Design a protein with these regions (language model features):
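Short, small/polar-rich loop/turn modules that mediate ligand/substrate recognition or access, typified
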Residues: 83, 173, 178, 236-238
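Substrate-binding pocket helix/loop in short-chain dehydrogenase/reductase
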Residues: 93-94, 101-106, 206
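Active-site loop immediately N-terminal to the catalytic Tyr-X3-Lys motif
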Residues: 95, 146-152, 174, 213, ...
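Active-site helix of classical SDR
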Residues: 117, 157, 165
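Alpha-helical segment proximal to the catalytic Tyr-Lys
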Residues: 122, 170-174
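Residue(s) in the substrate-gating loop at a strand-loop-helix junction
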Residues: 141
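Short C-terminal tail/terminal secondary-structure segment
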Residues: 146, 226, 237-255
Length: 255
């Protein structure tokens, strides 16, 4: 039995990844601060039975994260995988952004990700002692690779995620824990959708930002995460994989 914990599991990329891993036979513990979203998650995937568990967890709270992983540890002796997809988006120029928004971005996107990995690590290392290679996948962004106006603080958090990925990959390799990240471009998620265009038409402003002529769906990113969680990725460590339709390669400017 392969067991994965997924933060931000109730929506967006976390939801898509939960579905994908359940379909591939994983037992998934979905973590989110949205209790109604977790209830909806359980209802949507009730057919997977006891292979889906949920736990309320606010990654911005060290106490909440510790409690969630203590609960996981009491139920399971190990974790084979961790996907940190909980995230926050705030838009604004660096000279105008409120201190509260700046702090909130780092609290969730960087500190929350690190807290989750820190609390999960004993369970991930336990899988390594059983001869398995445990997996950690972080959600970075092409914003951490290529920056643009109005997203400086968000970009800084994602650049930090990339740095954490590479350092943790080296630190944890001896314990048979692989650490990688995916770096999506614009993805059609509830977090991103309000920032895309008037009227909620997610293709209105974004159809030209990718050489493929569309923005990503959560399933596009979940597929790459599933690969990194699979045995086929057993020699991939410290990688940051763009899932962007060629956006970074083409240097297509935002429209």
């Amino acid at each position: 039995m392969r067991i994965a914990a997924i933060t931000g599991a109730a929506s967006g990329i976390g939801l898509g990844t939960t579905k994908r891993l359940l379909e591939e036979g994983w037992t998934v513990v979905g973590l989110d601060r949205d209790t109604a979203g977790l209830a909806a998650l359980r209802g949507a995937f009730a057919g997977f039975g006891e292979r889906l568990l949920t736990e309320v967890c606010d990654v911005a709270s060290a106490e909440s994260v510790a409690k969630a992983f203590q609960t996981i540890g009491r139920r399971f002796s190990r974790l084979n995988g961790l996907v940190c997809s909980a995230g926050l988006l705030r838009i604004g120029t660096l000279d105008q952004m409120a201190v509260e928004d700046f702090d909130a971005l780092f609290a969730v996107n960087v500190r929350g990700l690190w807290l989750s990995a820190r609390e999960a690590m004993p369970l991930l290392k336990a899988a390594g002692t059983e001869g398995e290679l445990a997996r950690v996948v972080f959600l970075a962004s092409i914003s951490g690779l290529r920056h643009k106006i109005d997203s400086g603080a968000y970009a800084a958090t994602k650049a930090a995620v990339i740095a954490l990925t590479k350092v943790m990959a080296v630190e944890c390799a001896a314990d048979k824990v692989l650490v990688n990240a995916v770096a999506p471009a614009t993805v059609d998620t509830p977090m991103v959708r309000p920032h895309l265009s008037p009227g909620g038409n997610t293709r209105y402003r974004t159809s030209g930002t990718s050489p493929l002529g569309r923005i990503a769906e959560p399933e596009d990113v979940a597929a790459v995460i599933a690969f990194l969680m699979s045995k086929d990725a057993g020699y991939v460590n410290g990688a940051v994989i763009p899932v962007d339709g060629g956006t970074v390669a083409a240097f297509v400017p935002p429209r």
